[in-house]
């Protein structure tokens, strides 16, 4: 059974958040936490919080199963664009430049690692 966590309206550009999301896609949860802990990107803190929330959601959905972080993996992680705040910056000759302060929505899905037996 898989569990999902969503972080909405994060004030980070989706392009910057996707760089961090690509680092942990498909990794086991313990590996993903180690990667995020050692990352220098500011977006890694938001990904770490959402990953911990997804693991907690999984344990709530499966109260009879006790798994370590190395038995769960990041099944899916994706970043969608959120609403943009539009601001004006004064420019020369009476003009104005538009500044778009972007935001994003982060979704993480975790699932149990299936041990496949080869014959």
UniProtKB/Swiss-Prot annotation:
Keywords: Ribonucleoprotein, Ribosomal protein, RNA-binding, rRNA-binding. It holds the Pfam family Ribosomal_L22. GO terms for molecular function: rRNA binding; structural constituent of ribosome. GO terms for cellular component: cytosolic large ribosomal subunit. One of its GO terms (biological process) is translation. This protein binds specifically to 23S rRNA; its binding is stimulated by other ribosomal proteins, e.g. L4, L17, and L20. It is important during the early stages of 50S assembly. It makes multiple contacts with different domains of the 23S rRNA in the assembled 50S subunit and ribosome. Part of the 50S ribosomal subunit. Belongs to the universal ribosomal protein uL22 family. This is Large ribosomal subunit protein uL22. The lineage of its organism: Bacteria, Pseudomonadati, Chlorobiota, Chlorobiia, Chlorobiales.
